[in-house]
Amino acid sequence: MDIDILIEDDRWAAMDLDVLVRDVLRAISDTLTLDLAAAEVSYLACDDARIALLNADFREKATATNVLSWPAADLAPVVAGAVPTTPTVDVTGALTLGDVAIAYETCEREAADLGKPLAEHVTHLIVHGTLHLLGYDHIRDSDAALMQGVEAKILGKMGFDDPYMV
């Protein structure tokens, strides 16, 4: 796996994002039976100000959010609730997935609101953002149900509770 992690906000340094991201990718690979050995993916660990700029530029929403994803390929299913298309390697043998950005303050605030450790919430959001790279989405209800179920399975493999069970 070729994983690039850019830490723009020093508060992320306290969390071993390299290990966390590798653990997430392994759990996704195991759960979805995907071979991600050739995967290329980038993560930006930033602050709310940076993610608000990205959100404004790419989604025309000038507010901070927890996580943003930019898939390298459109793997989303045409039929609502269907499993996304399996990603394939390119002519160079690389499996380019895309990019994910995650904002510290929003993650910290949400974790506190949920009464969860920051690392647990960040793990969920890294899973969530990475699943977007793999064609999962939550715009349509049936797609959201599928994505949330997959997230719960992946997080369960990692020893975490289902984040959608309140």
Swiss-Prot record:
Record: residues binding Zn(2+): 128, 132, 138
Subcellular location, record wording: Cytoplasm
Principal EC category: hydrolase
InterPro entries tied to this protein: MetalPrtase_cat_dom_sf_prd, YbeY, YbeY_CS
Keyword Translocase: no
Assigned EC number: 3.1.-.-
Coiled-coil parts of chain: none
Any one biological process term the GO annotation gives: rRNA processing
Cofactor(s) recorded in Swiss-Prot or TrEMBL: Zn(2+)
One Gene Ontology term of the molecular function aspect: zinc ion binding
Top-rank taxon: Bacteria
GO cellular component terms attached to this protein's record: cytoplasm
Family matches, as Pfam families: YbeY
UniProt keywords, alphabetically: Cytoplasm, Endonuclease, Hydrolase, Metal-binding, Nuclease, Ribosome biogenesis, rRNA processing, Zinc
Principal location: cytoplasm
Cofactor binding comment, as recorded: Binds 1 zinc ion.
Record carries keyword Hydrolase: yes
Entries under SUPFAM superfamilies matching the protein: Metalloproteases ('zincins'), catalytic domain
Function: Single strand-specific metallo-endoribonuclease involved in late-stage 70S ribosome quality control and in maturation of the 3' terminus of the 16S rRNA.
Protein family (similarity comment): Belongs to the endoribonuclease YbeY family.
Protein name per the record: Endoribonuclease YbeY
Originating organism: Roseobacter denitrificans (strain ATCC 33942 / OCh 114)
Lineage of producing organism: Bacteria, Pseudomonadati, Pseudomonadota, Alphaproteobacteria, Rhodobacterales
